[in-house]
Design a protein with these regions (language model features):
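Bacterial Sec-dependent N-terminal signal peptides
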Residues: 1-8
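A composition-driven surface/loop motif
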Residues: 42-386
Length: 386
């Protein structure tokens, strides 16, 4: 007998099973001593392929994928809608367009696989995921992926989802947010250990903005001086009545377990490098934050901060070079530049924290609650209430 396609077969001999890959068209014969041969159909990857070619894009939806349709306002603005609620579909994206975008609508978790894509949108977000579930963004090893939106747009971010982002893969993501945030998610945002780099080249608002929490397990995040508000901001997710949603994941916090974070706040008066409504928990990583603009703060939390080396060595360096904030909205609170501000308690268990407050009247560390040094080294003047 001949196989009609490449398959995996199970061969049973004397009660023991082994597997073999059989190429298409290969003749098989049942020889003496073989009890049976069982064919297993190959697993077909449920992937939609989107390839951008400047003013056009090709979309391939395999016939065995159910519930996915494509519509486009223009040939390079791709809109995909999925009604499939049982299968996690992969959207493989490559190519480039100087006037293109990808919008995905759906109600089930999905994966966006980036392999050297470069999109600039003249209308809104070049990557817009209208799905309130888990959105895995996987970058191919060694790939460089670029997204840029247009100034004056009404989109919430250059790279946006109404669900939660999980970035992974040993590639690079470059985001230029000319309209609003660079990256934003309504729910949490995670950067996995495998990520090579996330580079925010510009943000008209926050560089990375998320609800629920922000978590970084490794990789590298670089945020440049063209960000005009906070670098990384996590806030509580709210319901339609602006009340905090009661959910264990809705912590409003920042958790960083490793990797490197490099932030330059040189064009963002009153901005913060890390800003959390909830707790900031650092258990590993290397941080270099240059707070150059007036009134800037390297790190700020409305709650508590804990620093340790539970997951990796921790080194935090904040250069507080700015002076007093002068923007009109802060006239009632003309605060100075500061390295770290903790409204609650600050606990340092391990690691090295250094604040260089070289700006005029710049401050080191201010703690509204209790400051506890259990281990590690803190090279800064700490002003605590207790």
């Amino acid at each position: 007998m001949a196989t009609s396609m490449a398959q995996t077969i199970y061969v049973c001999k004397d009660g023991d099973y082994t597997t073999r890959e059989i190429a298409e068209g290969l003749e098989l014969s049942l020889t003496e001593g073989i009890d049976s041969i069982t064919f297993r159909q190959p697993v077909m990857e449920k992937a939609v392929k989107i390839t951008f070619q400047e003013d056009k894009a090709s979309v391939v939806i395999p016939s065995f994928i159910e519930g996915v349709t494509c519509s486009s306002g223009t040939s390079s603005d791709v809109v995909l809608t999925s009604t499939n609620l049982t299968d996690e579909i992969i959207y493989r994206v490559s190519g480039s367009s100087r006037a293109g975008s990808l919008t995905i609508n759906g109600d089930y978790k999905l994966t966006v696989a980036l392999d050297g894509v470069s999109l600039t949108s003249a209308k809104g977000a070049p990557l817009n995921i209208q799905c309130g579930k888990r959105i895995a963004v996987v970058m191919a090893d060694g790939s460089v992926n670029n997204f840029t939106d247009a100034a004056g747009g009404t989109n919430k971010a250059c790279v946006y989802t109404k669900g939660h982002f999980e970035f992974s893969g040993a590639g690079t993501l470059n985001v230029t947010g000319n309209a609003n945030h660079a990256i934003a998610s309504k729910e949490y945002c995670q950067i996995k250990r495998s990520v090579k780099a996330v580079n925010i080249l510009k943000a008209a608002n926050d560089a990375i903005h998320c609800g629920q929490y922000f978590q970084m397990n490794g990789g590298e995040v670089n945020i440049t001086s063209t960000t005009t508000n906070d670098a990384i901001q996590a806030e509580y997710e709210l319901d339609d009545n602006d009340a905090i949603i009661q959910d264990p994941e809705n912590t409003g916090g920042i958790v960083i377990k490793g990797g490197s974070v490099n932030i330059l706040l040189a064009n963002a008066e009153d901005a913060k490098g890390l800003k959390a409504e909830g707790n900031i928990d650092i258990t590993g990583g290397t941080f270099i934050i240059d707070a150059v603009s007036n009134g800037t703060r390297g790190m700020q939390t409305d709650a508590n901060m804990t620093i340790s080396e539970a997951d990796a060595p921790t080194t935090i360096t904040v250069n507080a070079k700015g002076t007093k904030c002068t923007v009109a909205e802060d006239a009632a609170d003309p605060h100075n530049c500061m390295g770290i501000k903790v409204d609650g308690n600050l606990t340092v268990n391990a690691g090295t924290v250094t604040v260089y407050n070289t700006g005029k009247k710049a401050k080191g560390i201010k703690v509204g609650g209790t400051y506890t040094l259990n281990g590690g080294t803190v090279n800064a003047v700490v002003d605590s209430a207790q």
